[in-house]
């Protein structure tokens, strides 16, 4: 209720919004994924969780990767009232600049000491320190943390799968069909 009051006062969102959190995971020169988690008035809606593997040509840019993920999510799901970006004002402004839709966008950035609870919420109307606004911190930090957890989980899964496939395909006499049979046999 307090978070909804904040949204009403500061972002003119008058109903229980569908908030989608985005996070980018991956290292430079490696696979990169964008995760998307959806929250409604009942909490997380895992049926709308998605992650997207970022194409290699834009994977070196977190900002372009983020825009790629947001656009892909909006195209496939589309049911969004508020975008929450794990990043700062730069991330928020870059996403807004590259979207051709009228969807509210906010961002959560870590504080100077990167301690939990010292984050800042960025909106088009200004920035708010979480330590001074207990009413907004729980909801937005929960969404940010869930997006981060989901991003890391999927990044690690993809990375492990890529390593396994790469290793098996390097074995003499083992091709894609044998690899598929091995995965099917061991259900992994």
Language-model regions: role of each:
Residues 1-188:
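Acidic, glycine-enriched active-site microenvironments
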């Amino acid at each position: 209720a307090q978070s909804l009051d904040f949204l009403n006062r500061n972002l003119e969102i008058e109903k229980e919004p569908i908030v989608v959190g985005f996070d980018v995971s991956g290292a430079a020169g490696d696979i990169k994924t964008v995760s998307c988690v959806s929250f409604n008035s009942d909490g997380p809606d895992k049926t709308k969780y998605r992650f997207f593997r970022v194409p290699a040509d834009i994977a070196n840019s977190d900002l372009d990767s983020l825009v790629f993920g947001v656009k892909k999510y909006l195209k496939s799901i589309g049911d969004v009232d508020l975008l929450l970006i794990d990043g700062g004002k730069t991330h928020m402004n870059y996403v807004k600049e590259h979207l051709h839709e009228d969807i509210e966008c906010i961002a959560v950035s870590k504080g100077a000491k990167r301690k939990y609870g010292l984050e800042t919420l960025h909106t088009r109307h200004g920035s708010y320190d979480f330590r001074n606004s207990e009413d907004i911190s729980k909801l937005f930090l929960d969404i940010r943390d869930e997006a981060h957890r989901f991003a890391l989980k999927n990044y690690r899964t993809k990375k492990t799968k890529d390593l396994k496939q790469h290793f098996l395909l390097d074995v003499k006499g083992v091709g894609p069909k044998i690899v598929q049979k091995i995965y099917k046999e061991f259900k992994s």
